[in-house]
Amino acid sequence: MQVTIDGVPYVPVSNTACSRIGIAISTHNRAGVLSQAMEHQLRHLPAGALVVVVDDGSQPPATVPTSVNLIRHDKSMGIVASKNASLNVLMDAGCEHLFLWDDDAWPIADGWWLPYIESPEPHLSYQFLDLAGARKLNDLAVLYRDDQHIAYTGQRGVMLYYHRS
């Protein structure tokens, strides 16, 4: 459906978002973990999404399915360089919604991207509050909470979301 207001056409996000979603996964020397991540990412993939793996100098080099683009650093440049490479390739591809995943995290349900692209916030993350085992860090506190968002005093994200804006 398209609506025109004062001569300006508007199309609902749900009609266009999937073709402009970009997913980048950073990896380094974890072939088995990356394989699991790829299985889950492709199972719950938004229609038309671009998927990229940034291999940060893995030995042996990472391998990906033919439907996935591979960016490789010949030698490890670190997580920051991998995330920057992820942003660059997704922006260059014209993606509007950018999801940067670590290789040890993945979606577990269809439609996982909808709360992110429907949020008015241009930058969000999925993160864990503390360690799963008996050892606890207890270093994060809740700053803000509403019915859609929680803001913490620190960052421990395994997936970062950015809107192109």
State each model region's role.
Residues G48-G57, I71-H73:
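Short beta-strand/loop segment that forms part of the nucleotide-sugar
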Residues E39-G48:
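Short, acidic, metal-binding catalytic loop of nucleotide-sugar glycosyltransferases
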